[in-house]
């Protein structure tokens, strides 16, 4: 050992030469080849830009991808507040529009922890899920709905009403508006369904052609004169109802159009017979001090009505009164919509009929006004139920099992459909085979075919 130390001390150069020789002889690779060197130097990206590629500028990756940045730091990169805001909405919580939440063709705009749907015409709601065109639920209008030129839903009301503040509902604009029951104790009605169904508002005009289920031109059946199986109405419950007196009292009914005009069935009236109209009537054998009597000074049957050919085709007529009626809670007009909506209301499927006709076939007449709710009968069933002609200006209503119907003496009276508490005239009681017979239905004049004629003839000057 001492010898080694002596050699190292005396010959340091010799030791250095030996160490260099050892290192040069060692098999050690210091440098990597080209392919392996690239694997180390090319680190993986830590952010997949996706939809944000258009925003990647300057030092965005260094500022906001390698570490969390602030809005101000992102603003320094974009140098534009609008583009920074768009980037920031996705950077903070991701793209809220990625799941396509907007329905019915709506476009989505991302926001922080939220999104906004821009809806096309006819749709609204958080996700454009609500269809608000007139075709669906009447555009949420209480009475009438139209699509304006700029594709917006516009609600409107019948005469005597105005739009409420919400621009959807209708409120009375006159003391005694049409179709409203204003006597408080008469509010108990089994109301028809008033929610607008999803209906086709375009196909509301059918051609007036005969549905050829028969070839017979003359008919042998009963004029309706009474509601069978109905209930006693309360005073003022049907304030548009009138009774016609002539050679016989209460031979037909009718409805108040306005202070000067009554609408009834054409087969009820004869131009050579004096007719008296009584409005505000309830019990025809008692004086209740609500009655108003007027004489008829003019009868206008529909111009297509011809009793010699068919007593019940175009079965509608107008009666002009000598003095105007005084409107009150017991004397109120019935509402008459336009052709389109009268047809729509009829399709609701249920209406009220009323009158003082016979309580059963060939039986006694009613003393107190009767009323009955009757369902609309589909046209195919209606045609199969009778051998007589059912024209397109007629419709059937009633019960297959029988027992409830209008009957002799009810003719000319109203078939009304209630819409959100307001009643509209949809039919006129016309004819039927006996009364309340099983498998038979009441036949009514379809008012939608005649509303333009009614309004033209009954204008108040």
From Swiss-Prot:
Q: Which residues form the Gla domain?
A: 47-92
Q: Which residues carry this modification: 4-carboxyglutamate?
A: 53-54, 61, 63, 66-67, 72-73, 76, 79, 82, 86
Annotated residues for binding of Ca(2+) 5:
72, 76
Q: Which residues carry this modification: Phosphothreonine?
A: 205
Signal peptide range equals 1-28
Give residues annotated as binding Ca(2+) 4. Answer: 61, 66
Q: Provide the residue positions that the database annotates as binding Mg(2+) 3.
A: 82, 86
Protein name, as recorded: Coagulation factor IX
Q: Which organism is it from?
A: Pan troglodytes
> Gene name?
F9
């Amino acid at each position: 050992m001492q010898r080694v130390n002596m050699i190292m001390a005396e010959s340091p150069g010799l030791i250095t030469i030996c160490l260099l020789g050892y290192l040069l002889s060692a098999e050690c690779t210091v440098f990597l080849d080209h392919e392996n060197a690239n694997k180390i130097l090319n680190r993986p990206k830590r952010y997949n830009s996706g939809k944000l590629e258009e925003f990647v500028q300057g030092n965005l990756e260094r500022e906001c991808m390698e570490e969390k940045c602030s809005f101000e730091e992102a603003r320094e990169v974009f140098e534009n507040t609008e583009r920074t805001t768009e980037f920031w909405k996705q950077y903070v919580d991701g793209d809220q529009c990625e799941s396509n939440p907007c329905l019915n063709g709506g476009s989505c705009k991302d926001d922080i922890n939220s999104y906004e749907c821009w809806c096309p015409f006819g749709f609204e709601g958080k996700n454009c899920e609500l269809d608000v065109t007139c075709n669906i639920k009447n555009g949420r209008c209480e009475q009438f709905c139209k699509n304006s030129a700029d594709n917006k839903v516009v609600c409107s009301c019948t005469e005597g009403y105005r739009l409420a503040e919400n621009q959807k509902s209708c409120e009375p604009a006159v003391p005694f508006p049409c179709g409203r029951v204003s006597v408080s104790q008469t509010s108990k009605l089994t109301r028809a369904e008033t929610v607008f169904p999803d209906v086709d508002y375009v196909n509301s005009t059918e051609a007036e052609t005969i549905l050829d289920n028969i070839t017979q031109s003359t008919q042998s059946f009963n004029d309706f004169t009474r509601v069978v199986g109905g209930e006693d109405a309360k005073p003022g419950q049907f304030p548009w109802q009138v009774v016609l007196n002539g050679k016989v009292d209460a031979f037909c009914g009718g409805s108040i159009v306005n202070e000067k005009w009554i609408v009834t069935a054409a087969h009820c009236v004869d131009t050579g017979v004096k007719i008296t109209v009584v409005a505000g009537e309830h019990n025809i054998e008692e004086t209740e001090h609500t009655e108003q009597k007027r004489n008829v000074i003019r009868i206008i049957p529909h111009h297509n009505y011809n009793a010699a050919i068919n007593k019940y085709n175009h079965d509608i007529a107008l009666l002009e009164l000598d003095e105007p009626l005084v409107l009150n809670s017991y004397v109120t007009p019935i509402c008459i919509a336009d052709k389109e909506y009268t047809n729509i209301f009829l399709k609701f499927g249920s209406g009220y009929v009323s009158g003082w006709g016979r309580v059963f076939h060939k039986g006694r007449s009613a003393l107190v006004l009767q009323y009955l709710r009757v369902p609309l009968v589909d046209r195919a069933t209606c045609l199969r139920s009778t051998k007589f002609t059912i024209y397109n200006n007629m419709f059937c209503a009633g019960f297959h099992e029988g027992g409830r119907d209008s009957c002799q003496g009810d003719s000319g009276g109203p078939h009304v459909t209630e819409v959100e508490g307001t009643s509209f005239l949809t039919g006129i009681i016309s004819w039927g085979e006996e009364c309340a017979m099983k498998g038979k239905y009441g036949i009514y004049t379809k008012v939608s075919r005649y509303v333009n004629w009614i309004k033209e003839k009954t204008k108040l000057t």
